[in-house]
A protein has these predicted regions:
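Basic, polyanion-binding surface patches
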Residues: 1-202
Length: 202
């Protein structure tokens, strides 16, 4: 037996809670931006995040409502996606506080920054991965805005690379689940994709 839900009858807020409970786990884009005046560095977690394209390399995140991150990206055309590692759990959550626009999360939460190579917004110094992006385009959908950025530089900390490739067991990325739940890396399984020429498997 299944329980059926009608989005229209349930209402937007209740269906949001349902969607975020079943579309799991969701990787977190910890997005750093600069305000238009260049004086305030903002940092916020966004869990509606994924890769949109690999050639050209495009990542996307969704701003639910018009928040500082979106305004800054629209004004400057640049942002950095920092990987949200498990060891910074409390700080990541704290950067989700609705600070006023003039108060940057780096300073408010006490997060060390480092300069980016290709864009103006800083990177999170303690994050093992930073994807420096320039704005490709935005798409307004209802009250949300989909932000697509072209990755112009990627910086990966050396100690998380195994055999030339970032290793998830060393990256230890956080994810968002339903309600106030967060996920961490548990069991990792390796299973190669089966090419059609080898189907059915013996």
């Amino acid at each position: 037996m299944r329980v059926d839900y009608d989005p229209g009858a349930l209402g937007a807020s209740a269906f949001y809670r349902l969607l975020t409970a079943v579309v799991v786990p969701r990787p977190i884009a910890w997005v750093s931006t600069l305000a238009a005046d260049g004086a305030t560095a903002n940092l916020a977690p966004h869990s509606f995040f994924t890769v949109a394209c690999t050639d050209p390399p495009i990542v996307q995140f969704t701003s639910v409502g018009r928040k500082d991150t979106l305004r800054n990206v629209e004004a400057t055309g640049e942002f950095v996606v920092n990987l949200a590692p498990e060891q910074l759990f409390e700080q990541i959550n704290a950067t989700g506080v609705d600070f006023p626009a003039h108060q940057g999360e780096f300073d408010a939460v006490g997060i060390e920054r480092e300069p980016s190579l290709r864009v103006a917004p800083p990177r999170v110094a303690a994050s093992p991965v930073a994807l420096e992006c320039t704005l490709h385009s935005t798409l307004r959908i209802g009250a949300s805005t989909l932000v697509l950025g072209e990755v112009v530089h990627a910086a990966v900390r050396e100690d998380v690379i195994v055999d030339g490739h970032p290793d998830i067991r060393r990256l230890r990325p956080l994810s968002r689940l339903g309600r106030d739940e967060w996920g961490a890396v548990g069991e990792v399984r390796d299973l190669a994709r089966i090419p059609y020429r080898d189907w059915p498997p013996s």
